[in-house]
Amino acid sequence: ELYRGELEGKKGITPILFTQFPYATVATTFSATNGVTDSAAAGTALATGNKTKNGAIGVLKDLETPVNSIAVWAKNAGYRVGVATSVSVDHATPAAFYAHAGSRSSYYNIGKDLYEAGFDFYAGSDFLDPTDKGKSESLYDMAEKNGYTIARGYKDYMKKCKKAEKMILFQPEAASQIDRSSIPYAIDRKKTDLSLQDITRSAINFLTKDQDKGFFLMVEGGKIDWACHANDAATTFHEVMDMDEAVKVAYEFYSQHPDETLIVI
């Protein structure tokens, strides 16, 4: 907030929207096996309410017993469901909402679980291992078989969204050829790059079309963590501000539907 204020040339802070929300709480962050969690165990705790072993996705610490997420509960209750991130769609945090794997590195099998879950909308940079290192059927080929349309970038999404029954939004192919693991950092972004704001807007647009029962959407600003690992303060600040822009998109929806919308950061 202080950095944002400095960028705007003023003394003091420019508040981030989600720090102004009326309620706050605390959570324990240790995993079932470690004092310091990782994204897989933390994602599983967030998604399912169960602590598990570091590295595990959607299973208990025995690495075998599956546990369902709030996203699965919502889908089973008839709501539309979306899972979105600024990193690969099969990365630990998004995967915890739809997959079950003893290892977060089982990217191909996690990708297959994406189709098994059958959620309405997924978004991220791409699949990390779409062909199981060339040994198995392409996850891209599975998309059409499972009723999904793949869009590459926001403009492509806008062209395809009306006719699509279920949607997977990825960054443009040219961007994935450079780095399929994530969309570019906000500080490096070009006009043609997919942004978390684009992803959030697309998700809400898709999940609310042709129905009014409601939806569940998880959106992750996944590169905040990466920038922190790199001890890159400026990049971290820009990623947080970028997440705030995505929250603003969700808040716009809340402003139109205040009695039936809950935003949790």
What are these regions, as identified by a protein language model?
Residues 103, 192-200, 239-243:
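Phosphate/oxyanion-binding active-site loops and adjacent basic polyanion-contact surfaces
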Residues 92-98, 175-188, 203, 211-249:
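Active-site His/acidic residue clusters
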Residues 117-120, 128-129, 165-192:
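Formylglycine-dependent
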Residues 1, 242-265:
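Metal-dependent active-site segment of extracytoplasmic phospho-/sulfohydrolases and closely related
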Residues 153, 157-171, 199-222:
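Active-site regions of oxyanion-processing enzymes, predominantly non-cytosolic
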Residues 1-132, 137-161, 165, 241-242:
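N-terminal catalytic scaffold of extracellular/periplasmic and nuclease hydrolases
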Residues 81, 215, 261-263:
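Hydrophobic anchor at the start of a short beta-strand
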